[in-house]
Amino acid sequence: QKDMLKLLFKAADLMNDIFWVENVEAKDAFMLGINNEKDRQYALINYGPWDEMNNLAPFIKGYGDKPAGAQFYPENMTVEEFDKFENPNKTSQYTLIRRNNKTRELEIVWYHEGFKEKTKAAAELLLEASKLAEDPGFATYLKLRAQALLIDDYFASDIAWLDMKNNLIDFVVGPIENYTDKLFGYKTAHEAYILIKDVEWSNKLTMYAKYLPQLQKELPVDAAYKMETPGSDVELNAYDVIFYAGDCNMAGKTIAINLPNDEQVQLEKGT
């Protein structure tokens, strides 16, 4: 399992690299322009020149306000231009909006194409790690997640992730949350967590998980707000996070997750 973890760390580092590009630009290119050591250290924490803990105030000379859409969209794109852009995949959480070099018109680029080198390398690492996984469910998840990174379809891997019951090591990886896209909230950013399950506390939480469907029914709100019934295969677990990468590591650390975000997965299986 130690050899497997080494591969997961490498895959997580690739999510770090991708998130830098999504948030500001490639890390090495960005850091070259910063000479002050304190600024360099704080930029590493914030994945860029904007203070995430202080209303995105720029702390490095030469930078203005952070683009609302980060680097998911062209900085000179207007909302009106986006609205007129006729492409069914423009609102996909797994596409970048770019400008065609020749026509200057908007076009979409799927994540697996825009970050081809990194996603392919991460997928290969996950496949290699799956061969070392002791838990069969975790091995299946890693294989499906590797495929998902290459095609931008995460449904099967999300289901496999929820099906895991006995794995002590967990790995959350890929484009997941949309908080960095403050323009429309469409685009999800890359991140990774490596976690070790706290078995004792997870067992204590099991009793609460089984009551969640009933608790939803008893919420003091109109029935109209309770029409969707989530899947009953819900889990509550406690983990020690041993590594954060990408979006979840920017400025503060994410300390709780409720995944997957896919509503269809939630209805079929839960979270």
Label for each model-derived stretch:
Residues 3-7, 85-271:
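Fold-level signature of zinc-dependent metallopeptidase catalytic domains
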Residues 1-141:
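N-terminal helix-rich structural modules
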